[in-house]
């Protein structure tokens, strides 16, 4: 069995990859997109966090995934589960999170960690709140498009007539709930066919590890970013409608 971790950005992509690797799977480090992948395992943490574009390799997703070996995992925001029948030897771990959390987290990643996104840098926009509004205007819709694709995956899983989408090869989770206690880790380990007794230690080891975009040294007042302008832009994204639809589909969000 191979594993593809499909996430909304900032919903535990690298955290889940690290955790699952500690359960006995091999992390390729492939961050998969449609026509390329980031070869994160071939570069150090500094390069991955600040200059991820340097790790980019051109290759169609199908080629990247089908070349993987049994027991390996890859990850990304590209909706491979929408084509799950093309990958019968894959198990899909799908992780979502509330957009108020993912939007802020991705903004912080773009502004404070990455050094290859000039339009959102502190040199370009001095005030953090203005920069957050600029991020929401320029990138918010793209972010919510990925959210909508996760909704699409869930809708197909919930539809009994869509027999190509097999429940037994998909595990859906809320990343914030996953972090709250061992129950989520135990459930994921069991879903992957791993002894659940291994999960608590693996989870604590991953918590202590430095993964690619974990905010361990950034002090940002996230609440203060939500000024009136940011709230107005957020409302225009219809993000809460996405959240409500997720709840209707059974999401714990």
Region locations from a protein language model:
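PAPS-dependent sulfotransferases, especially Golgi type II membrane carbohydrate sulfotransferases
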Residues: 1-2, 160-164, 192-253
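PAPS-dependent sulfotransferase catalytic domain
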Residues: 1-119, 145-168, 172
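Generic structural signal for hydrophobic residues
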Residues: 16, 20, 184-188, 233, ...
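Non-catalytic, well-ordered alpha-helical segments in soluble enzyme domains
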Residues: 24-26, 184-198
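Short amphipathic alpha-helical segments that mediate assembly, nucleic-acid/protein binding
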Residues: 57-61, 129-133, 143, 230, ...
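An amphipathic alpha-helix signature
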Residues: 100, 182-186, 239
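A solvent-exposed, charged loop/short amphipathic helix patch at secondary-structure junctions
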Residues: 110-141
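Phosphate-binding beta-loop-alpha motif at adenosine-nucleotide cofactor sites
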Residues: 165-191
């Amino acid at each position: 069995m191979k594993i593809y971790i499909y996430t909304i950005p900032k919903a535990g992509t690298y955290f889940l990859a690290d955790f699952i690797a500690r359960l006995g799977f091999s992390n390729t480090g492939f961050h998969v997109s449609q026509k390329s992948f980031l070869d994160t395992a071939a570069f150090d943490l500094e390069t991955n966090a600040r200059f991820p574009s340097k790790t980019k390799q051109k290759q169609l997703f199908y080629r990247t995934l089908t070349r993987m070996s049994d027991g390996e995992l890859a990850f990304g925001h590209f909706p491979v589960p929408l084509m799950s029948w093309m990958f019968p030897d894959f198990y899909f771990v799908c992780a979502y999170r509330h957009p108020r959390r993912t939007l802020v987290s991705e903004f912080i990643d773009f502004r404070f960690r990455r050094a290859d996104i000039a339009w959102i840098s502190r040199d370009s926009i001095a005030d953090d709140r203005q920069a957050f509004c600029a991020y929401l205007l320029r990138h918010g819709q793209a972010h919510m498009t990925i959210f909508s694709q996760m909704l699409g995956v869930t809708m197909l899983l919930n539809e009994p007539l869509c027999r190509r989408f097999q429940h037994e090869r998909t595990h859906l989770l809320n990343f914030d709930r996953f972090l709250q206690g061992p129950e989520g880790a135990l459930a994921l380990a069991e879903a992957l066919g791993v002894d659940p007794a291994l999960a608590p230690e693996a989870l604590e080891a991953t918590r202590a590890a430095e993964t690619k975009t974990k905010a361990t040294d950034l002090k940002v007042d996230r609440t203060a970013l939500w000024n009136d302008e940011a709230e107005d832009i957020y409302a225009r994204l219809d993000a809460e409608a996405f959240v409500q639809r997720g709840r209707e589909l059974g999401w714990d969000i």
